[in-house]
Regions:
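Glycine-aromatic micro-motifs
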Residues: 2-140
C-alpha cells in the first residue's frame, strides 16, 4: 500500500519526538525530521493513545518526516503498519488505517502518509488544540 513517490510520514502521537518512545527511536533510524506541520483533522484522547480522525473544520499538530533511504521505505512503513495495527490477522480489529494527507508546514504544503483512527471516538475527550504534547503538558 505505497503510492510511488510518497516517502513522507506525518505523526501526531507516540511517534512524535517529544515522547522518546521505542517507536520514536525506530522511526528516527529510518526517517529524518522535516519540521512541525498540521493536517485537517480532530484529535481525541482515547486514554492510552490519541486518535486522529479526518475533519475539515479543525487541525492536528504533528511532525513531518522523510525516509532517509528510499529503497527502505516499504519495509520501514510496513513495520509501522504493524505497530499501528493496520496489518491485522483473522479476528483482530484494525485500529488504524494508513492514508495520504495534505500536510501544511510553515513554508509549503506536501503530501505524506498518516495513520487515521478507524474506531469510534464517541464520548471521548476532544483535544481542542490538536496538539497531543501540549495537551499532556496542560493535564499535569
Amino acid at each position: 500500500m505505497n503510492n510511488p513517490g510518497v516517502y513522507k510520514l506525518f505523526v501526531y502521537g507516540s511517534l512524535r519526538s517529544g515522547f522518546k518512545s521505542h517507536a520514536y527511536e525506530y522511526i528516527s533510524r529510518f526517517f529524518s525530521f522535516d519540521g512541525i506541520g498540521k493536517v485537517n483533522g480532530k484529535l481525541f484522547d482515547m486514554g492510552t493513545y490519541p486518535a486522529g480522525v479526518p475533519a475539515a473544520d479543525a487541525f492536528i499538530v504533528g511532525e513531518l518526516y522523510t525516509i532517509k533511504n528510499e529503497p527502505e521505505f516499504s519495509w520501514a512503513i510496513g513495520q509501522l503498519d504493524d505497530y499501528e495495527g493496520v496489518s491485522v490477522v483473522t479476528d483482530e480489529i484494525q485500529l488504524f488505517r494508513r492514508d495520504l494527507v495534505d500536510v501544511f508546514t510553515e513554508n509549503a504544503t506536501t503530501i505524506a502518509w498518516i495513520f487515521w483512527y478507524t474506531g469510534s471516538v464517541e464520548g471521548k475527550p476532544l483535544i481542542e488544540s490538536g496538539d497531543l504534547i501540549q495537551y499532556l503538558q496542560q493535564k499535569k
